[in-house]
Amino acid sequence: MKNMYFIAIIAMLAISCKKDQASGNTAVNSGEQELGKKSVNAVSTIFFSGITWNIKDLGNKTVGPGPNYWAASSVWVDTQGFLHLRLKKDPATGRWNCAEIYSQQKFGYGSYVWEIEGRPDQLDPNLVFGLFNYKDGDDGHHEVDIEFARWGNSQWPNFNYTVYPAYGDPETRYSKTYELALNGTYSTYKFTRTSQIVSYKSYHGHTQNEANSFYADTTPTGFPVSTEALPVHLNLWLFRGNAPTNGQEVEMIVHSFKFTPQ
């Protein structure tokens, strides 16, 4: 009888220990999963101008545009809330890491305004700095661009407005170029989307004062502009993946992005 009593006690203790161990393991695993999620989120998203953005980070893979390497370390928001996009050379690998973010939210008709700090008019001919709408998976359609780029040729204009059609041949895109010469490190860029047109206007300084405006343009009547809500992208990258001709790293600072619906 005593033997049976002791066996029962031992069995109960064993079950209790297993429950404690299971509970402990579950807590640790849960904590690790939560930590993992937070770590992933910390490097894959960023909060800027009241919007959550995804960060393009492909590790050792090269993808377009370019193709290029893309790294989360090339993107950050400072204590003032300003967004930094930096083209950086990795000293360990010799790779140039590019920067891109895109909004989780989609935006439709209305005005899109970016306040920039830096000299995008003085970028190396192999660099591209873009502010744009883009529909992933439908390259050549549903895209509205402001791009600072000479496309690898130092003799070409450095400022580009481009609107891709909602349908049809991408080669029918509407595009205008301009030789940009800023008068300082602050500038503002805007496009407005409606169901019929896309209109552009840019400004010296962080203002939309008409006296500071330059290079206004509008798509022609009948051009098939996108009518879809689209994410907003900002990127800094190398044309065809070619290193800067001057070998210099570059940083662009975006003070704000604002969308005003219409």
Regions found by a protein language model. Give the residues of each.
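Bacterial signal peptide processing site
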Residues: 18-20
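Low-complexity, Ser/Thr/Pro/Gly-rich disordered linker/stalk regions
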Residues: 25-129, 133-137, 143-152, 212, ...
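Sec-dependent signal peptide recognition
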Residues: 2-8
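C-terminal motif of bacterial Sec signal peptides marking the signal peptidase cleavage site
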Residues: 13-16
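Short tryptophan-centered beta-strand motifs in secreted/extracellular beta-sheet-rich domains
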Residues: 112-114, 185-193, 198-202
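Aromatic sugar-binding interfaces of carbohydrate-active proteins
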Residues: 181, 197-262
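Extracellular/lumenal carbohydrate-interaction signature centered on repeated Trp-anchored short motifs
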Residues: 101-111, 177-185, 192, 225
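Glycine-aromatic-enriched beta-strand/loop faces of beta-sandwich-type recognition domains
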Residues: 136-185, 237
